[in-house]
């Protein structure tokens, strides 16, 4: 990321006149204040293509993967929404069945609608003292999977908006026992890996796909998110295909 930022900074200071998008032409007079508009560019020589990364963006994503200890990591410029849509689409065939935590983000419901899925909902436990939804019960996950062998993936949100973390390791083991992947919406937990004071990231607990919103808890601009592919239970080829569909082209 340091190299990418430096290259953008250097290009912004150059005297190249941009006969390309975006329409502001890197002209700082277009916007009041100190917004670094000169670093806002399109796919030009030296800056790679996010959907077919071979250079500086591939290098940055590989560095991200090493930092989080994943099989592959991908940037999402459409927030965690694109990551969630991608993860579900790559894990469950159109019209298939999925086990979903009822307190999930609306992007999950959008994926269910778009892919015409048949969802089974698992409700979180209640924390009556705090008046909020609690974690997802491992035993309930196991029961639903035993009762319905046609379920193709499990999806939970951990941490929730209230900071509740489920037992990802045990839920992952339950899913894997039935030969299916666990998708974790970890949008609010991108910071977990950087301190022992935080819970352990789902990427380190056996989840197969983990989606994080860097802009929620890390110093990143709005919409910045990542999708971590952590195992071979979900096709990398399908992840790449659906990211290309759901992200801006």
Name what the model sees in each region.
Residues 36-79, 103:
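Conserved N-terminal alpha-helix of the aminotransferase class I/II PLP-enzyme fold
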Residues 1-55:
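N-terminal "arm"/small-domain region of PLP-dependent enzymes with the aminotransferase-like
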Residues 4-11, 30-33, 67-70, 80-249:
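Conserved PLP-enzyme active-site core in the AAT-like
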């Amino acid at each position: 990321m340091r190299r990418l930022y430096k290259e953008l900074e250097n290009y912004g200071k150059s005297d190249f006149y941009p006969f390309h998008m975006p329409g502001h032409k890197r002209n700082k007079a277009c916007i009041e204040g100190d917004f670094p508009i000169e670093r806002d560019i399109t796919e030009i020589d030296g800056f790679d293509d996010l959907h077919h990364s071979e250079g500086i963006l591939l290098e940055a994503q590989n560095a991200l993967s090493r930092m989080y200890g994943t099989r592959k990591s991908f940037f999402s410029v459409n927030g965690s929404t694109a990551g969630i849509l991608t993860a579900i689409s790559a894990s469950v065939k159109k019209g298939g069945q999925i086990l979903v935590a009822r307190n999930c983000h609306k992007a999950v419901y959008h994926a269910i609608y778009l892919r015409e899925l048949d969802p089974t909902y698992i409700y979180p436990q209640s924390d009556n003292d705090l008046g909020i939804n609690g974690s997802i019960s491992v035993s309930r996950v196991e029961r639903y999977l035993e009762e319905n062998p046609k379920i193709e993936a499990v999806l939970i949100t951990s941490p929730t908006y209230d900071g509740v973390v489920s037992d990802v390791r045990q839920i992952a083991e339950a899913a894997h026992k039935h030969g299916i992947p666990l998708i974790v919406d970890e949008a609010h937990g991108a910071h977990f890996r950087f301190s022992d004071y935080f819970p352990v990231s789902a990427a380190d607990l056996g989840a197969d796909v983990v989606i994080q919103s860097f802009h929620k808890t890390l110093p990143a601009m709005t919409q910045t998110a990542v999708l971590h592919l952590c195992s071979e239970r979900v096709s990398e080829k399908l992840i790449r295909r659906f990211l290309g569909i759901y992200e801006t082209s």
